[in-house]
């Protein structure tokens, strides 16, 4: 039977519940247990797909095409279990499901209330999510409850967790509470009162945490841990210090060294083998002792909030681990390029344009792409970054001066990039879209496989075919492909059913490394293996740096 660990947060948000939950999962997996994770989000949106990156950060796409919280990306990077749609749900989905049942008459005329109907539905979603785990029936399901204890929107989720713990019985569920222990510089000491009050809030609703994870900018002294233990009624050895680290991949070892996994296993009456965190130690060793160093410029419009590119940043870090190369990322606002030109790019070893939406900043990205192509600087374009690379090539090489995307200019006569109106999803069902379709949940989403053209750089990187995740509603227009290919551009991968261009590149006779992909390879990169596309990109950046150094 699956046992549950509920992870809650207190005092403030953004303390790192997702990293803590993923790190615990990684330790338990290293002990031979089958583990899955779920994220419960208390907002009323059905999913984060239409939320601003400035408010929510990255939208992580699962294999089965769900638009989910970025914490699911952390989960997949830390454990081997793949996430699915059932691993993330929101208040919006819960209420939508309950209202549908009420309309069907499932409640037989009863008054539908938060308790028991909403809380029962939350419990059903949790158990369904655990049961759908790709690892088979999990030994442990770690459930991260979003928001902060005390927030009104989190109360139904906390109440559902309390009821579920009671229903499952002793040794079947436990609670881990992550809280802040701030350092007050003027007083010169850590303050435990916010943690005490946060635990008090939990106890008011009937939840007694078994473990406290105390976030601070430094290790918490024993005297402070004893004080927290006494006032929160949590054993002293279960008051665990989680201090700031320069890499999230150090957190599993930090938690294991303080016995978190032992406490959880004892509470759940599990007796797995000892933890083997040698892989994490090796990763940290590689991270701290690179042999080379490169600087890659990421040109986008969300550069002031790097959470918008979380998986992409981590994918570059994974590539750095597997190429022994420290990757410095410079975030460059594409609107600044529009105003000031490309001088800010000239010291870079490579240029990357990530995915995005909307017209704002696109001409700056196109200018950056033009610079990378003409200066022979390695270039990687992802999703929108590929579409803009095709537009730049069409304008400046092929001579289609009005080339554009209908996303930015619906009336352009040279629709090099246009809305996809029909395609097959990963189950083989036909999806259709028009300009008037809803924005939410209407993109081409999820993992799709396509063959690669022999003799291309794409084949060198991936092999015979590619299976990556998508999140887009616009695509390179096949009508213009013959003109693009006549100019030298190579479409190196296409979908087998709809013949949609999935990858483009320039031949080495035109450029040493210039690749665009319509999919999002960052979603499948892990620290264990890295990703072949990002490894090749970092190697190209290093080769460019060394060539420029030799010329100098």
Swiss-Prot record:
Residues 295-547 form the Glutamine amidotransferase type-1 domain. Allosterically activated by GTP, when glutamine is the substrate; GTP has no effect on the reaction when ammonia is the substrate. The allosteric effector GTP functions by stabilizing the protein conformation that binds the tetrahedral intermediate(s) formed during glutamine hydrolysis. Inhibited by the product CTP, via allosteric rather than competitive inhibition. The active site is at residues 383, 520, 522. ATP binds at residues 14-19, 71. It is an enzyme of class 6 (ligase). Mg(2+) binds at residues 71, 144. One of its GO terms (molecular function) is identical protein binding. GO terms for cellular component: cytosol. UTP binds at residues 13, 191-196, 227. Pathway: Pyrimidine metabolism; CTP biosynthesis via de novo pathway; CTP from UDP: step 2/2. The keyword Magnesium applies. Residues 1-270 are annotated as: Amidoligase domain. Its EC number is 6.3.4.2. One of its GO terms (biological process) is pyrimidine nucleobase biosynthetic process. CDD domains: CTPS_N, GATase1_CTP_Synthase. Catalyzes the ATP-dependent amination of UTP to CTP with either L-glutamine or ammonia as the source of nitrogen. Regulates intracellular CTP levels through interactions with the four ribonucleotide triphosphates. Homotetramer. This is CTP synthase. It comes from Burkholderia vietnamiensis (strain G4 / LMG 22486).
